[in-house]
A protein has these predicted regions:
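Single conserved hydrophobic/aromatic residue that forms the stacking wall/gate
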Residues: 1-8, 12
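Arginine/glycine-rich "motif VI" loop of SF2 helicases in the C-terminal RecA-like domain
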Residues: 10-15, 99
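C-terminal binding/interaction regions
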Residues: 18
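Short, structured patches in soluble enzyme cores that scaffold and shape functional sites
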Residues: 22-26
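Accessory alpha-helical/coil subdomains and C-terminal extensions
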Residues: 27-67, 121, 167-173
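Glycine-rich phosphate/nucleotide-binding loop
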Residues: 65-69, 73-176
Length: 176
């Protein structure tokens, strides 16, 4: 039930009145499949009670306009894997560029600490573990292609949710 999304977002983000955005193929109301359109209408009906931004596109996810992205697992997984692929592509291009000349190699040597900080910051293994909200239990879905570091981070997410009585907080918030 989309109307409970804000309550789920409140608890998960530990933030009062988080901004919700609904992932869609466009920001126009005529775009999207029937499920997305119906979810939009459901969220719009309760928008006085929630902070509903409206439709967001894939390129809006990381702009900071929304705190919680409402999506189905299929579209969400595509968005996530696309972002990971773009990050890998950027690093491949950078690596090839730095190998192109002696000056580039020196530039790489000088900028390596900054590049490593950036790479660490966007490492998808660090954020591994998609929380499936709205279930009567803790479910954290790990990326199938991760390594031990990423898998441990997904387990840490699950442990944190358990330690913080996540399910009880959700039940209180949305009054199941």
């Amino acid at each position: 039930d989309a109307s409970k999304s804000r309550g789920l977002g409140d608890v998960y983000k530990r933030q009062k009145n988080p901004v919700l955005g609904l992932l869609n193929v466009g920001s126009e109301h005529i775009k999207g499949n029937s499920v997305v359109k119906q979810t939009f209408e459901d969220l719009k009906k309760i928008s006085p009670k929630i902070n509903f931004y409206g439709f967001i596109e894939g390129n809006d996810i990381n702009k900071g306009n929304v705190d919680v992205v409402v999506t189905d697992g299929f579209s969400g997984n595509i968005a996530l894997k696309t972002a990971e692929g773009v990050a890998e592509l950027i690093f491949t291009f950078l690596k090839n560029s730095y190998k192109s000349s002696l000056v580039s190699k020196i530039g790489y040597f000088l900028s390596k600490p900054a590049i490593n900080r950036f790479k660490t910051r966007i490492d998808p293994r660090k954020y591994n573990g998609a929380v499936l909200l709205g279930l009567n239990g803790i479910v954290v879905k790990s990326h199938g292609g991760t390594d031990a570091f990423g898998f441990c981070n997904a387990i840490s997410v699950a442990v944190s949710l358990i330690e913080n009585s996540y399910i009880n907080e959700i039940e209180k918030k949305i009054k199941i």
